[in-house]
């Protein structure tokens, strides 16, 4: 019996020693209730972001006789060298060049319905077939020239299609008819 009493006393001593070295869970933390609240609630969303000084230098796109065709259509027309570089970029990324043309409206328009849909000018007629396997940018520009001869009053654009992801990755106007 004496041995059992000694061992239980040793266990009790160890447990008490471990409890004595433990730190209380919130020792040293202060309550936030003692800090004064000096922040006012600002529910005005106009103070979050502002372009105040820049408003005077912004301009509005003139909509009369200045139609927008693609994302960067406000830039000057691309020269033959710039077109060649764009097509080389398209081919370097592994995209398939496609040519499309539109004979009546080279811009988005809504003739049949007020809501966007198939007949709102976003879908153009494809020129021949996509140029699968094309590795030379001059071949694409030769097709643009051929399309110009066939339809001189049409808008012609070049599209880069990623056939792996099944998405159109790039699109730009290669030719606009006279007067546009």
From Swiss-Prot:
Ligase as UniProt keyword: no
CDD domains membership: RuBisCO_small
GO BP annotation list: photorespiration; reductive pentose-phosphate cycle
Superkingdom classification of source: Eukaryota
Molecular function per GO: ribulose-bisphosphate carboxylase activity
Keyword Plastid: yes
Pfam families (UniProt xref): RbcS, RuBisCO_small
Compartments where found: Plastid, Chloroplast
Keyword terms, alphabetized: Calvin cycle, Carbon dioxide fixation, Chloroplast, Photorespiration, Photosynthesis, Plastid, Transit peptide
Gene3D superfamilies: Ribulose bisphosphate carboxylase, small subunit
GO cellular component: chloroplast
InterPro entries: RuBisCO_ssu, RuBisCO_ssu_dom, RuBisCO_ssu_N, RuBisCO_ssu_sf
Transit peptide residue numbers: 1-56
Record's miscellaneous remark: The basic functional RuBisCO is composed of a large chain homodimer in a 'head-to-tail' conformation. In form I RuBisCO this homodimer is arranged in a barrel-like tetramer with the small subunits forming a tetrameric 'cap' on each end of the 'barrel'.
The protein's role, per its UniProt record: RuBisCO catalyzes two reactions: the carboxylation of D-ribulose 1,5-bisphosphate, the primary event in carbon dioxide fixation, as well as the oxidative fragmentation of the pentose substrate. Both reactions occur simultaneously and in competition at the same active site. Although the small subunit is not catalytic it is essential for maximal activity.
Subunit structure: Heterohexadecamer of 8 large and 8 small subunits.
Family: Belongs to the RuBisCO small chain family.
UniProt name for this protein: Ribulose bisphosphate carboxylase small subunit, chloroplastic 4
Gene: RBCS4
